[in-house]
Amino acid sequence: VGCGGLRAIDDRHGEIKRMYVAPAARGTGVSTAILRRLEAEARALGWERLVLETGEQQPDAMRFYEREGFSRIPLYGHYVDSAISRCYGKSL
């Protein structure tokens, strides 16, 4: 139905990777449940901040992350030169 992962950036920061929910399961709370679990795992690892990348062609994803407390940040890492990426961050 859905998935998501975490990648360490350093001892205090991590990145949400590959978060996806099947179209049929969107709007059912699955996205929120996955994100809450990822945030809990990040806190358990001692991380203070999470970042993520999504595509500018994914307005539902952008609204979701903003609703969940993420703010737009400058492009980072592999996405610095991307014309189609939007990056977000959230302090835990």
What is each model feature region?
Residues 1-17, 22-23, 35-37, 41, ...:
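Acetyl-CoA-dependent GNAT
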Residues 13-14, 18, 22-33, 43-45, ...:
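Conserved glycine-rich acetyl-CoA-binding loop
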Residues 48-51, 55-69, 74-92:
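C-terminal "cap" of GNAT-fold acetyltransferases
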